[in-house]
């Protein structure tokens, strides 16, 4: 089967469904693809095509995820749906499927349930910037007041986790009825699509963000100086610009005097490219793997942060035993391991393989970091967990 050429005409936005088990996330995913295909063109995906999600590996962790695509007149959406609760936790923490916004599915027949709360909290911790609510199964609730009550509960829950509950779009619909072709409920899916278009801003492209390059290797070239290599994570570096070297040691400034790719000289290096950057007046032993080159002032080194972490189960090749406070693993950021100590939340004595947990981490050396930075937890080179920086402390 030949792959279709990907058309880059429209802005591309990543979204996904979140919410409690059996509230209708997968049915809604199928309904969106079906109704939008019927209305604006594109491919419909049936419920069972989405439900038996293929397994994939992200950072050594097995996650089942379904990816579907759909279009509105103004945008192209890539949408993820996970079959099981554990898959959501892993997906959101590893960032395997980054979301520019999420559709929170809440069954009007049940109202908010434990996983509703947990997914909202995870969204807050891992930096999902926008949430839209789809109140599902509204065809099964005759009482208007009950719908009002459920909507109010969901809004309060969002506000509790620092999302703007009062301003969040809430669409009342029935994914199943829409999927069956009932025009009244199909209209609600179009309303949801319009909310996605208007409420989730177009994401800033990596190339428009401040320059950052994680350093993978450092070479000394006689007569020319020091070259660092790596893949530009975001932004652009131009020859002649000042850059900072951040992390592990004290931050220093230097100037980029050359950029090369595949032994060709360029005048700039752009997001996504593997490049060598020549630095003026910097000695080979002043730089090491694990530091980053960055636009001056755009990122700071930190040692202490709150994180949301998933600990691999034994079956995933993780630990066989729990760990306790005082645990000192390595934290792998971008290109290097740094040892750190952990503090567990109050009342938590131990962490079992397969758990997800909030923990405070203190590293023995500073790393250039912002909220949302992903990391792996390793013991002797073996991955035992995955995490994300939820909040920088110091």
UniProtKB/Swiss-Prot annotation:
Q: Where is this region: G5?
A: 174-176
| Record key words, sorted | Cytoplasm, Elongation factor, GTP-binding, Hydrolase, Magnesium, Metal-binding, Nucleotide-binding, Protein biosynthesis
InterPro entries annotated for this entry? Answer: EF-Tu_GTP-bd, EF-Tu_GTPase, EFTu-like_2, EFTU_2, G_TR_CS, P-loop_NTPase, Small_GTP-bd, T_Tr_GTP-bd_dom
Sequence segments annotated as region (G2) = 60-64
> In which residues is GTP bound?
19-26, 81-85, 136-139
What does the record give as EC number? 3.6.5.3
The UniProt entry's GO CC annotations, sorted and at most eight, read: cytosol
Compartments, as annotated in UniProt: Cytoplasm
| Ranges for domain tr-type G | 10-204
**GO function terms (MF aspect):** GTP binding; GTPase activity; guanosine tetraphosphate binding; translation elongation factor activity
Q: Where is this region: G3?
A: 81-84
Family stated for the protein in its record: Belongs to the TRAFAC class translation factor GTPase superfamily. Classic translation factor GTPase family. EF-Tu/EF-1A subfamily.
| NCBIfam families noted in UniProt | EF-Tu, PRK00049.1, PRK12735.1, PRK12736.1, small_GTP
Description of how the protein assembles with itself and partners: Monomer.
Q: What does this protein do?
A: GTP hydrolase that promotes the GTP-dependent binding of aminoacyl-tRNA to the A-site of ribosomes during protein biosynthesis.
Instruction: Specify the protein name.
Output: Elongation factor Tu 1
User: What organism, scientifically named, is this protein from?
Assistant: Photorhabdus laumondii subsp. laumondii (strain DSM 15139 / CIP 105565 / TT01)
């Amino acid at each position: 089967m030949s792959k279709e050429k990907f058309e880059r005409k429209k802005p591309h936005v990543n979204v996904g469904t979140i919410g409690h088990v059996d509230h209708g996330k997968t049915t809604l995913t199928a309904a969106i693809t079906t109704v939008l295909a019927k209305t604006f063109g594109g491919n419909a995906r049936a419920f069972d095509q989405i439900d038996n999600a293929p397994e994939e590996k992200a950072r050594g962790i097995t996650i089942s995820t379904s990816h579907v695509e759909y279009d509105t007149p103004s945008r192209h959406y890539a949408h993820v749906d996970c079959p099981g609760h554990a898959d959501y936790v892993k997906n959101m923490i590893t960032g395997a499927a980054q979301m520019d916004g999420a559709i929170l599915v809440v069954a009007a027949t049940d109202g908010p349930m434990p996983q509703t709360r947990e997914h909202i909290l995870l969204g807050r911790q891992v930096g999902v910037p926008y949430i839209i609510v789809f109140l599902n199964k509204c065809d099964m609730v005759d009482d208007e007041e009950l719908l009002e009550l459920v909507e109010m509960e969901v809004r309060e829950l969002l506000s509790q986790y620092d999302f703007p509950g009062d301003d969040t779009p809430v669409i009342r619909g029935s994914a199943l009825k829409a999927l069956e072709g009932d025009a009244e409920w199909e209209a609600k899916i179009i309303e949801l699509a319009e909310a996605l278009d208007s409420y989730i801003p177009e994401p800033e492209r990596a190339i428009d963000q401040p320059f950052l390059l994680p350093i993978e290797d450092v070479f000394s070239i006689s007569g020319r100086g020091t070259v660092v290599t790596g893949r530009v994570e975001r932004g652009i570096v131009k020859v002649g610009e000042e850059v900072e070297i951040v992390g592990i040691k004290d931050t220093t400034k230097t100037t980029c005097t050359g950029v090369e790719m595949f032994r060709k000289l360029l005048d700039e290096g752009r997001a996504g490219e593997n490049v060598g950057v020549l630095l003026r007046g910097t000695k080979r032993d002043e730089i090491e793997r694990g530091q980053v080159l960055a636009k001056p002032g755009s990122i700071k080194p930190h040692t202490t942060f709150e994180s949301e972490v998933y600990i691999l189960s034994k079956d995933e090749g993780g630990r066989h035993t729990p760990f306790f406070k005082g645990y000192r693993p390595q934290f792998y950021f971008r290109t290097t391991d740094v040892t750190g100590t952990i503090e567990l939340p109050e009342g938590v004595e131990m962490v079992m393989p397969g758990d997800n947990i909030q923990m405070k981490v203190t590293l023995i050396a500073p790393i250039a970091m912002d909220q949302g930075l992903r990391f792996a937890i390793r013991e002797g080179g073996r991955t035992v967990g995955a995490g994300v920086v939820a909040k920088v402390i110091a």
